[in-house]
């Protein structure tokens, strides 16, 4: 369980947080440069990263539900007073991203941005459900850790800069591959 948790935390903090700005950058490259970059391949890579992340997250939820001795907490959250947030979390984190198995949806930038936003919202609903049910059950706010964040504006700047850099790297990779294919055929 710790391995799954570590993998999802690494993906969430290092890659997934920057998907929305990265997808916007890919969309801008698609609009501004028409057929210059292989944006469909980049979108396909992003889609499969989202699908793999969703499968790992789903396995983590299933493992927690079946094998952890506190599995009652999962069913209690799904049927308790904050059930709406739990089901929003499942919809955003597990159900909606699996629609990317359909190629027609996978190649639409707007839909990918929507799915990325829904997944990020699902992650926040997950934290909300865990913290609020803990406070509701224990009536003790000391048990919930409060995270210190950077100022909001700097945080947003970092997200967009790193998202744009990731998009440029991804598009550059496909551009270099295309150049090597052309060079090897001549």
Language model: regions and residue ranges:
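Membrane-helix interface motif
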Residues: 62-71, 126-140
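Membrane-helix interface "capping/anchor" motifs
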Residues: 100-113
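Membrane-interface capping segments at transmembrane-helix boundaries
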Residues: 31-35, 171-186
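Transmembrane-helix bundle segments that line or gate the permeation/cavity pathway
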Residues: 123-134, 174-180
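Membrane-interface transmembrane-helix boundary segments in multi-pass integral membrane proteins
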Residues: 73-89, 141-169
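Central hydrophobic cores of alpha-helical transmembrane segments
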Residues: 110-123
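Hydrophobic cores of alpha-helical transmembrane segments in multi-pass inner/ER membrane proteins
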Residues: 14-28, 88-100, 157-177
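Long, contiguous internal "core" modules enriched in hydrophobic/ aromatic residues
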Residues: 1-74, 79, 86
């Amino acid at each position: 369980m710790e391995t799954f948790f570590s993998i999802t935390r690494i993906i969430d903090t290092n890659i997934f947080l920057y998907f929305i700005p990265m997808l916007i950058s890919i969309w801008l490259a698609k609009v501004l440069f028409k057929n210059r970059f292989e944006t469909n391949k980049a979108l396909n890579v992003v889609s499969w990263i989202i699908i793999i992340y969703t499968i790992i997250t789903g396995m983590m939820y299933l493992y927690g539900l079946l094998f952890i001795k506190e599995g009652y907490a999962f069913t209690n959250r799904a049927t308790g007073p904050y059930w709406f947030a739990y089901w929003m979390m499942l919809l955003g984190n597990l159900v909606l991203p699996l629609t990317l198995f359909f190629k027609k949806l996978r190649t639409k930038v707007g839909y990918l941005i929507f799915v990325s936003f829904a997944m990020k919202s699902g992650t926040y609903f997950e934290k909300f459900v865990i913290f609020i049910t803990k406070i509701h059950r224990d009536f003790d706010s000391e048990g919930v850790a409060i995270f210190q964040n950077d100022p909001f504006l700097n945080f947003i700047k970092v997200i967009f800069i790193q998202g744009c850099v990731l998009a440029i790297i991804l598009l550059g990779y496909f551009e270099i591959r295309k150049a090597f294919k052309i060079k090897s055929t001549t």
